[in-house]
């Protein structure tokens, strides 16, 4: 029988070329499988006894060694023969050899999730959304109180030396970065344009002054938006948000919640949340189009002017 690192396989119409375990530092050595730390139960205990001992979902979560996604792999980006694998705990850089066999070059431990990655030239862009993220990539978390040490947004790394990636820029955002999409660049002005999709909670404006939550009638809210980020290739430290358009707004009424406002569609239908965020945006540059997966909606944007995306209804 297969175990954690030598699992048995079932495969159809595919060929497994190679399989690599997570590098050191990219998993919890006390819980390498990432499972919940469940206490052993007496197999002879009757059902009634089990019910008495059972904990709530919240209490069970507190008993885990580490949250289930703390070390999960998420996204892969490529540049020539280089492969970068993002994760909730940082990223790993591999060199691809003949036959597609990857060899680890370096690992960067930088927690915060989700770890969505893109590569443009010698710059690696990474999404960070969790409240444990820190500006300095530390593993100790950032606490529960507002602090300038917390980081949620877009990180930029210089990977010109694959063995020694260096963080050269950050962009703090109100809802972090679940995913991001490189829209264009670098153009003649030497700038990369990125669309950021934040789906996490809105941070306290004591921590970031421009952030406001769901306050009725307050159009400053960080909800119902994407962020347009500009990255100067020659000086990524000057990267910034240039605008945060309300892409779900009703053009006639100006209401920010211009699409689905939440609820159900009638008897025996599921209840869904209001459309106020995008999970991911895919870009089709030659057609000047972007497609967003946004709270259950598939949305097309005209990005002829990438600084001013227009929703196509």
Question: Where do the model's predicted regions map?
Answer:
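Feature marking well-ordered beta-strand scaffolds used for ligand recognition
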Residues: 1-313
């Amino acid at each position: 029988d297969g175990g954690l690192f030598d699992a048995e396989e079932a495969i159809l119409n595919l060929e497994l070329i190679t399989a690599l375990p997570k590098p050191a530092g990219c998993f919890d050595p006390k819980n390498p499988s990432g499972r919940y730390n469940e206490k052993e139960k007496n197999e002879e205990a009757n059902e009634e006894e089990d019910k008495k001992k059972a904990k709530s979902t919240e209490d069970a979560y507190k008993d885990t060694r580490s949250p289930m996604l703390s070390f999960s792999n998420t996204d892969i980006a490529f540049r020539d023969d280089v492969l970068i694998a993002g994760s909730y705990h940082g990223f790993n850089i591999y060199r691809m050899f003949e036959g597609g066999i990857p060899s680890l070059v370096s690992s960067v431990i930088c927690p915060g999730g989700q770890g969505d990655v893109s590569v443009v030239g010698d710059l690696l862009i990474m999404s960070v959304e969790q409240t444990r993220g820190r500006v300095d990539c530390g593993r100790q978390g950032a606490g529960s109180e507002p602090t300038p040490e917390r980081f949620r947004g877009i990180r930029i790394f210089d990977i010109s030396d694959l063995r020694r990636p260096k963080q050269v820029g950050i962009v703090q955002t109100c809802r972090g970065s679940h995913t991001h999409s490189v829209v264009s660049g670098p153009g003649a002005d030497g700038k990369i344009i990125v669309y950021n999709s934040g789906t996490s909670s809105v941070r306290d404006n004591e921590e970031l002054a421009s952030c406001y939550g769901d306050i009725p009638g307050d159009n400053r809210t960080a909800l119902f938006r994407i962020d347009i980020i500009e990255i100067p290739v020659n000086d990524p430290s000057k990267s910034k948000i240039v605008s945060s358009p309300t892409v779900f707004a009703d053009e006639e009424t100006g209401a920010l919640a211009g699409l689905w406002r939440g609820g159900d569609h009638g008897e025996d239908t599921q209840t869904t949340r209001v459309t106020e965020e995008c999970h991911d945006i895919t870009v089709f540059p030659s057609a000047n189009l972007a497609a967003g997966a946004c709270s259950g909606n598939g949305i097309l944007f005209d990005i002829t002017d990438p600084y001013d995306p227009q929703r196509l209804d």
